[in-house]
Amino acid sequence: MSRFFLRNAFMFVVYAYLYIPIIILVTNSFNKDRYGLSWKGFSWNWYERLFNNDTLIQAAIHSVTIAFFAATLATIVGGLTAIALYRYRFRGKQAVSGMLFIVMMSPDIVMAVSLLALFMVVGISLGFWSLLLAHVTFCLPYVTVTIFSRLNGFDSRMLEAAKDLGASEVTILRKIILPLALPAVVSGWLLSFTISLDDVVVSSFVSGVSYEILPLRIFSLVKTGVTPEVNALATIMIVLSLALVVLSQLITRKNNH
């Protein structure tokens, strides 16, 4: 009984540590008190101010745009890479797998400096394209590993049987591999979208003054204190994240049935 109680108490403390700050943030986004020190009544005032703050709205649009295209490109390239690693034998296969894990384990600051040096050598100006390429780079390994792990759990004899029955590689890819990998594809896209939307370190190195994204804008604002508009914006982002998670679960459940 005591062990059961301690386990549940520990889990309660962990979840409280994770979610109480989020609850406070969401609550303060509706609080009339600017500093959130006490509850002074429900108000939509901070959301109205947020939507009148053109700088924050523009930064949010930039972030969502970068995250969408980065996640989509990373999912396409990462999916094809995962299929190649799972389906075919080729020289350098182990090296490709190793490089993916190296990118995943590299500190953000190392990734940021490396990409900045590359863009300077190649001549890519800092802005939209440098941000997009950087975000695709650090999202790609996560998508590849997610999809490959899903494919690696399937019996490859099913693919060989389809090939023996005369199915072409395109048919096998379209009729067997892609439907089986769909939950991992959706998960990989959502993971990439979240990682891209949340990145600060790499983005701070490769972004230009002409294309400011939301994490960098918020980072510059919180140096002087968290404003209620930031709380309101964070609440909207939380709702968006929850909606994406629910959508992912619905797609996965539909595919499994």
From Swiss-Prot:
It holds the Pfam family BPD_transp_1. GO terms for biological process: transmembrane transport. Residues 1-7, 86-100, 149-176, 252-257 are cytoplasmic. Keywords: Cell inner membrane, Cell membrane, Membrane, Transmembrane, Transmembrane helix, Transport. GO terms for cellular component: plasma membrane. Required for the activity of the bacterial periplasmic transport system of putrescine and spermidine. This is Spermidine/putrescine transport system permease protein PotC. It comes from Haemophilus influenzae (strain ATCC 51907 / DSM 11121 / KW20 / Rd).
